[in-house]
Amino acid sequence: MTVKVWRGDKNGGAYQGFDVPRQDNQTVLDVVSWIQQNQDPNLSYRFACRVGMCGSCAMMVNGTPRWTCRTHVNKVLDANTLVVAPLRNLPPIKDLVADMDPFFDKWIEAGGHHNPSASRYDTMPQIAPDDTKRAVANESIECINCAVCYAACDTVAHNDNYLGPAALQRAWTLYNDEKVNDRDAVLAAVSGKGGCHNCHSQGSCTLYCPNDLNPMRAISGLKAATIKHHIKGGR
């Protein structure tokens, strides 16, 4: 098969073609690794666990963001051709390695870190597993920040200020966490210039999430919460 791999850096690049032998149960990550090991040792790419737990191997495969370790070639091969590139909406560092700093910077900007209302010396709060807010918060805790949703989002592509699906989903998780002290601060963080109301509800984030999460539903929740907060006199 023919594999076209993007080569370059932040200053630009182009696709380079490789002839790669087909194998049974071959993943896209297997293909990239074979190229690096057998044809071009200078090819740069990122991976770690190889079993769909870390998300670090995410790349664009035939125009779609995917975990390459869980993407089998026989499901995505088009006319015996595979096109592999770094994640969209992030600046490339080298070849297939995308710079994740903008993604995590926006995660922090959206208030993604936990601000507990109690200290280690306080009694641990008892929250029932079937508590409504606990259930909502639990919906998104399997996010591993792979940035597939960020790469899939057209709003991110056209709005540099937009926080992105993963950051907003994390904010929704914290907003529904009873242990968070200042929930108004969460809403303030996602109500600004790049906040939740920039989302066009196209649903690409939900469609392509490898963990079957629903960032669009989380963003819709934030939209409703920020509007209610504003109506009640919040700023």
Where are each of the predicted segments found?
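Ferredoxin-type iron-sulfur electron-transfer modules in oxidoreductases and energy-metabolism complexes
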Residues: 26-41, 85-235
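Iron-sulfur-associated redox domains of electron-transfer enzymes in respiratory
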Residues: 1-104, 150, 154, 158-159, ...
